[in-house]
């Protein structure tokens, strides 16, 4: 792989946790460098490169800084991290930890694996691959001056044979095999005190993340939300992100419903010490052999679930005068031998959208090759909240066939209503597109069924409304005000494919 592009990231001398540093556009890095690899890219047209990203900076074991390099190809987190960078966003997309104490770091970024589609040498409307640099754990010692590190991009651009590659996820009932990528827990912070302490990592791994008033859907949480609970052996790694002058001995145990009753029980419980390389493996403990992956709103995680508790059985210690807490970052890499409970919705329809409170009699809804962001000015729209909707939200593109079931309720007495529901399949747009099959259902039928092909001329469809030439559905209501509600359910048929791992804020 040859040098394809370069950039630089400026770092303030007082680099604190949560600050945003810079965003580098991969395409701009390559085109701006204008080297031989860019010429190859222009010749190839579309490519699925395996980038090697080298971040060059001098090692310093005294600052305690850890940065995050986050990869987002669909502009899902750009506006949310422009001032402060919450881990709810930076850790919800593919990311890599950059420890100041380690010095220059190399990361492999396989575009074909992460996005599942080819990359064009010029800007496109559906993707814009970027590297975001933010600070996860801040410095203990302020440096003498502001500085910068260099980011080098290495790649070999060979022509791709098709636009679509391997999907990131295929909908099926047995989708989870235990492997988890990019599942990083926000820093656990230990106080410097004489009292031994513990920090808990909740195993509510199917719960939707929350940032203030916003929900953040990411792939790992969505994948695990397909199941009610899970058991097995949690494998992962602990990164001690403090300066080298700090020290700690950690023991991890899995506990149900809170913490151990006394210190002796901690050593009697099955557990393990964190090895020098940070690795650990611990079986989930639960009276049900499984722990729930989500909770009811009023329930406390410490009372109804298993947790991984990281006990500081010795330390943390630091030189006199230090007051900053000791940050530790946990990454979960696998749940080996997963003991999965029943699916949340086994082989069933998902609620897509409800329409109600109609204010006009003649109503028409455009259902494009996408799933969400449906709106109306003449009725009330309520979108369903379910794993399938979340999976589409946390990907850039999707493709497959949906079986649709339409149902409605009437305002007046049954048998005395008139009007109907017309469903038409179309391609392109109303003015220049083509009309396909159409059917009319009387309101007194109370429902009907159809299907929708999700995709466009390129194959998979971006999460935008009719952004490319694609198939879509028009639902026209006659005498809409005589309906209380129109409900649309959907069920993915066969292998429904998702491309481009990312996240989504609502």
From Swiss-Prot:
Any one GO molecular-function label of the UniProt entry: structural molecule activity
Entry annotated with the keyword Transport: yes
Keyword Transport belongs to the record: yes
Post-translational modification summary for this protein: Specific enzymatic cleavages in vivo by the P1 encoded 3C-like protease yield mature proteins.
Family (UniProt): Belongs to the nepoviruses RNA2 polyprotein family.
Record's function text: The movement protein is assembled into tubules that allow the transport of virions from cell to cell.
Name the UniProt record assigns to this protein: RNA2 polyprotein
Organism annotation: Arabis mosaic virus (ArMV)
Record lineage: Viruses, Riboviria, Orthornavirae, Pisuviricota, Pisoniviricetes
């Amino acid at each position: 792989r040859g040098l394809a592009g370069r950039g630089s990231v400026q770092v303030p001398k007082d680099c604190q946790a949560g600050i945003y540093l810079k965003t580098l556009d991969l395409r701009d890095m390559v085109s701006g460098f204008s080297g031989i690899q860019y010429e190859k890219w222009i010749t190839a047209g579309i490519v699925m490169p395996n980038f090697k990203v080298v971040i060059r900076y001098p090692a310093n074991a005294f600052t305690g800084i850890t940065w995050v390099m986050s990869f987002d190809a669909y502009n899902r987190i750009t506006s949310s991290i422009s001032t402060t960078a919450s881990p709810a966003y930076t850790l919800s997309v593919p990311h890599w930890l950059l420890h100041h104490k380690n010095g220059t770091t190399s990361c492999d970024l396989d575009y074909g694996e992460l996005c599942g589609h080819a990359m064009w040498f010029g800007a496109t409307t559906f993707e814009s691959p970027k590297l975001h640099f933010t600070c996860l754990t801040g410095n203990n010692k302020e440096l003498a001056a502001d500085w910068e590190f260099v980011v080098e991009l290495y790649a070999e651009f060979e022509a791709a044979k098709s636009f679509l590659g391997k999907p990131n996820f295929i909908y099926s009932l047995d989708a989870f095999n235990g492997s988890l990528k990019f599942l990083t827990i926000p820093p656990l912070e230990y106080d410097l005190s004489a009292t031994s302490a513990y920090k808990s990592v909740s195993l509510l791994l199917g719960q939707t993340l929350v940032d203030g008033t916003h929900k953040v859907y990411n792939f790992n949480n969505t994948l695990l939300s397909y199941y009610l609970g899970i058991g097995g052996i949690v494998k992962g790694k602990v990164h001690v992100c403090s300066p080298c002058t700090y020290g700690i001995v950690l023991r991890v145990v899995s506990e149900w419903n809170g913490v151990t009753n006394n210190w002796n029980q901690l050593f009697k419980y099955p557990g393990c010490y964190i090895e020098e390389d940070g690795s650990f493996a611990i079986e989930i403990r639960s009276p049900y052999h499984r722990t729930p992956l989500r909770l009811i709103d009023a329930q406390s995680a410490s009372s109804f679930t298993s947790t991984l508790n990281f006990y500081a059985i010795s330390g943390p210690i630091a030189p006199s005068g230090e007051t900053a807490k000791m940050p530790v970052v946990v990454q979960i890499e696998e749940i080996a031998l997963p003991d999965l409970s029943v699916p949340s919705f086994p082989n069933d329809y998902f609620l897509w959208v409800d329409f109600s409170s109609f204010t006009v009699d003649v109503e028409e809804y455009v259902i494009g090759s996408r799933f969400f962001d449906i709106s109306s000015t003449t009725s009330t729209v309520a979108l369903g909240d379910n794993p399938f909707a979340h999976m589409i939200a946390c990907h850039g593109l999707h493709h497959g066939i949906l079986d649709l079931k339409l149902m409605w309720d009437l305002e007046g007495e049954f048998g005395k209503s008139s009007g109907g529901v017309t469903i038409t399949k179309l391609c392109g747009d109303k003015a220049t597109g083509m009309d396909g099959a159409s059917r009319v259902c009387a309101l007194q039928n109370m429902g009907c069924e159809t299907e929708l092909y999700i995709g466009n001329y390129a194959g998979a469809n971006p999460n935008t409304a009719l952004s490319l030439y694609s198939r879509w559905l028009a639902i026209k209501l006659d005498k809409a005000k005589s309906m209380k509600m129109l409900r649309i359910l959907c069920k993915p048929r066969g292998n429904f494919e998702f491309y481009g791992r990312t996240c989504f804020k609502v």
